[in-house]
């Protein structure tokens, strides 16, 4: 039986912290789907198309990882559609745990056959968040140490315009 997992997020933009979780999940599961979701609580900085492109470039080396765009639907519905029996969630800190525990409660109510697997972000990457990256971009500070090259290229393109 193939073990499939779904790792969801808005990835606005994808960070090295996200890639850390994706890489480690790729070793644990036969296939990892990255669910690129539109977060109704967040105003998108990069377009969905741009985020998908940056993600696909960043994960190119992982042969068992693919990106799916999913708007206006629940993660449990996407997981069922692709046959994923696991949600992968990254934890940077205790605030992430509180948020994720609440999310897991509702996911279990909707799909009790899907397990949530938590992966702690590597300590050197735990301070990195997409919102901090967007702040650095706004103030024209370098984001190179914190994001994949695909994001750096998009940021450089934006600054040229």
From Swiss-Prot:
It is an enzyme of class 2 (transferase). The record marks 18 as: Transition state stabilizer. GO terms for cellular component: cytoplasm. Substrate binds at residues 10, 42, 75, 89. One of its GO terms (biological process) is coenzyme A biosynthetic process. It catalyses: (R)-4'-phosphopantetheine + ATP + H(+) = 3'-dephospho-CoA + diphosphate. Pathway: Cofactor biosynthesis; coenzyme A biosynthesis; CoA from (R)-pantothenate: step 4/5. This is Phosphopantetheine adenylyltransferase.
């Amino acid at each position: 039986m193939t073990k499939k997992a779904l790792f969801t997020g808005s990835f606005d933009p994808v960070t090295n912290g996200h890639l850390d979780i994706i890489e480690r999940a790729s070793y644990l599961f036969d296939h990892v789907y990255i669910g690129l979701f539109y977060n109704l609580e967040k105003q998108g900085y990069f377009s969905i198309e741009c985020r998908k492109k940056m993600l696909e470039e960043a994960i190119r080396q992982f042969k068992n990882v693919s990106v799916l765009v999913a708007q206006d639907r629940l993660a449990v519905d996407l997981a069922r559609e692709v046959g994923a029996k696991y949600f992968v969630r990254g934890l940077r800190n205790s605030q992430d745990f509180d948020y994720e525990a609440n999310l897991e409660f509702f996911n279990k109510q909707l799909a009790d056959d899907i397990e949530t697997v938590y992966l702690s972000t590597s300590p050197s990457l735990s301070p990195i968040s997409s919102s901090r990256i967007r702040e650095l971009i706004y103030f024209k500070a370098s984001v190179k140490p914190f994001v994949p090259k695909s994001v750096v290229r998009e940021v450089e393109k934006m600054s040229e315009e």
